[in-house]
């Protein structure tokens, strides 16, 4: 909510529905399990809960989204049987349910502990944008649509365009 680039972004409306609600609805539509929004903001909690969704309040002191998810899982695990977590970015309303389901399928098929969904970077400006996390993969990824990530990075000094992707979401088995 307090992002410097676009304050309040999760609550901005697209076709009368907040961005965060669009993402929540996409997650729910997968029917993979219970969906929670982990947030530090009462406004986001209110938005999700007024539409019948589940939210978990977390600390404002987290350095990363992974830290926030860890806290949320710690709070939820005593009341829910959590096998894995799919971490969706709350500001990616165009994520497709098909992509979420494909990530789930591939992580299960490969018996992985973690998986990350990414996409080709088509806009050259994204390469130099330090606000966008990118991942470097290898030729195996190009052939099979999965491979170990070589590295995650924000800086762009040393990368090969051919093997660089923008991150969308990750799935973590617990």
Question: Language-model features: where?
Answer:
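Conserved small/polar residues in nucleotide/adenosyl-binding loops
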Residues: 172-174
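Short, high-confidence coil segments that cap the C-terminus of an alpha-helix
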Residues: 32, 80-82, 110-113
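Active-site donor-binding loop signature of nucleotide-sugar glycosyltransferases
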Residues: 16, 58-60, 90, 137, ...
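N-terminal glycine-rich phosphate-binding loop and ensuing alpha1 helix
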Residues: 1-39
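Conserved donor-nucleotide/metal-binding helix-loop-beta segment in metal-dependent transferases, i.e.
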Residues: 97-126
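Anionic-ligand binding region
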Residues: 120-170
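Short phosphate-binding loop-to-helix
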Residues: 36, 42-88, 92-105
